[in-house]
C-alpha cells in the first residue's frame, strides 16, 4: 500500500568553474621595470593590494614637489588678490557708483586666482597618482595566469603586463535541461547550492555556493537555459576550505520546488504508464499514472488510488484489465498469478 507525500525535487547539473572576472593588467605610467614580486609568476597567488612590480620612480618623485610649489604660489597669489580687493572695496566707498566696476573691485582677478589654485590642486593629485602608480598592485586576491614583462623592460602607458584571475569569487555556469526547468523555484536569486568535484578517489570535494542568476536566454541549439552558481573564495585563501581550481568540471546540486500528493514507486511497477492494483475480487485493474519525475530507480507519480488499494508487485506474463488472478499468500510482496 502506498501513501501520497510531499517531495522536494533535487536538481543536478554540471558546469566548469570560472573566475568572476579576469584582468589584463596594464601599466598606467611609463618607465623601466626595476623590481617584481617573486610570486608574480604564472600560477602564483597574490593578495589584494600586494605589489606585483615596480617602475623606476625618480622622474615621478620630483613631480609632486613641483606641483606642491605651484600650488603654494597659486594660493599666495589668491591671498594677494583678495587683499587688493579689500583695499579696492574700501576705496570704492568714497567714489561715485559709476566709477566702481568689477574690474576696479578686482573680481575677475580673484576668479582667475581661484581657478589657478584649483588647477594646481588637480596637478598635485595627478602627480601623486602617477607616483603611486609606479608601484603596480593586485586589484584583488588574484591568480597570476601569465606574465609578459621582466626586470629591465621599458613599459609605456597601456602596456599589458600580466593576466590575472580573481580568486575571491568563482562562478559555475551550467545548462539546465528542459525537464528540470519545470521544477525551478519561483525566485532563483539566493538559493543555496552545493558544488562538488569528484577528485578521482572515493573522496568528494564539496563547497557551498549560491545560485545568483540565470542567463536570461535559451540556447538556440539545445533549448536549454543556463544558471550561475557563485562560490566565495574557491581557492580557500581565507576560509581554509577545500580548493576548487578554475577549469574544474563540477556538479551543482540544489533544491527545487516541493511537489505535493505524489507517490514514490519503483520504476518496474509502471508499465505503459499504468500501475496495476487488485480489486476486492482479486482481479487486475490498470490505473493510468502521470509520471511527474524520475528519481533514481523510482518514479514520482500521480494516480487515482485509494489508501487501501493493493499494489501488485509481480504480474502475470500477459496481464489484462479485469483478469482474475490468484494471490500468493504469505509472500513478502504481493504476487499475482493466473489461476
Region roles according to the model:
Residues 1-18, 118, 182-205, 331-339:
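Acidic, gly/proline-rich low-complexity N-terminal segments at the extreme N terminus
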Residues 9-12, 69, 73-77, 81, ...:
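Extended amphipathic alpha-helical segments
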Residues 3-70, 139, 145-150, 173, ...:
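Long, amphipathic coiled-coil "stalk"/hairpin helices in large membrane-associated assemblies
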Residues 10, 169, 176-227, 271-274:
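Beta-strand/loop subdomains of soluble extracytoplasmic proteins
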Residues 9-35, 122-139, 164-166, 213-216, ...:
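Short beta-strand-turn/beta-hairpin segments enriched in glycine/proline and small hydrophobics
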Residues 16, 45-48, 130, 137-182, ...:
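Surface-exposed patches in structured soluble domains
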Residues 240-286, 290-339:
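Edge-of-domain interaction segments
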Residues 204-260, 267:
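Structural microfeature recognizing short secondary-structure transition sites
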Amino acid at each position: 500500500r502506498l501513501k501520497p507525500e510531499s517531495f522536494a525535487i533535487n536538481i543536478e547539473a554540471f558546469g566548469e568553474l570560472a573566475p568572476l572576472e579576469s584582468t589584463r593588467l596594464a601599466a598606467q605610467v611609463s618607465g623601466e621595470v626595476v623590481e617584481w614580486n617573486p610570486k608574480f609568476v604564472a600560477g602564483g597567488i597574490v593578495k589584494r593590494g600586494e605589489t606585483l612590480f615596480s617602475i623606476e620612480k625618480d622622474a615621478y618623485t620630483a613631480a609632486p614637489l613641483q606641483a606642491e610649489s605651484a600650488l603654494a604660489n597659486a594660493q599666495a597669489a589668491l591671498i594677494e588678490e583678495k587683499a587688493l580687493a579689500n583695499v579696492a572695496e574700501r576705496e570704492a566707498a568714497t567714489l561715485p557708483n559709476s566709477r566702481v566696476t568689477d574690474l576696479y573691485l578686482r573680481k575677475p582677478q580673484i576668479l582667475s586666482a581661484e581657478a589657478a589654485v584649483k588647477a594646481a590642486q588637480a596637478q598635485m593629485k595627478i602627480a601623486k597618482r602617477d607616483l603611486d602608480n609606479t608601484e603596480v598592485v593586485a586589484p584583488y586576491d588574484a591568480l597570476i595566469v601569465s606574465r609578459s614583462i621582466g626586470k629591465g623592460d621599458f613599459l609605456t602607458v597601456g602596456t599589458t603586463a600580466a593576466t590575472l584571475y580573481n580568486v575571491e569569487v568563482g562562478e559555475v555556469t551550467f545548462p539546465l535541461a528542459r525537464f528540470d526547468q519545470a521544477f525551478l523555484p519561483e525566485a532563483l536569486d539566493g538559493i543555496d547550492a552545493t558544488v562538488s568535484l569528484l577528485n578521482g578517489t572515493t573522496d568528494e570535494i564539496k563547497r557551498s555556493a549560491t545560485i545568483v542568476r540565470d542567463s536570461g536566454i535559451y540556447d538556440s541549439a539545445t533549448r536549454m537555459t543556463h544558471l550561475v552558481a557563485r562560490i566565495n573564495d574557491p581557492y580557500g585563501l581565507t576560509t581554509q576550505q577545500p580548493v576548487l581550481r578554475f577549469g574544474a568540471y563540477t556538479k551543482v546540486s540544489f533544491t527545487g520546488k516541493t511537489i505535493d500528493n505524489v507517490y514514490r514507486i519503483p520504476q518496474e511497477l509502471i508499465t505503459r504508464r499504468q500501475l496495476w492494483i487488485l480489486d476486492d475480487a482479486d482481479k487486475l485493474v490498470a490505473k493510468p499514472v502521470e509520471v511527474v519525475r524520475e528519481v533514481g530507480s523510482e518514479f514520482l507519480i500521480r494516480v487515482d488510488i485509494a489508501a487501501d488499494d493493493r499494489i501488485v508487485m509481480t504480474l502475470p506474463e500477459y496481464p489484462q484489465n479485469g483478469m482474475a488472478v490468484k494471490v500468493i499468500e504469505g509472500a513478502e510482496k504481493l504476487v499475482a498469478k493466473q489461476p
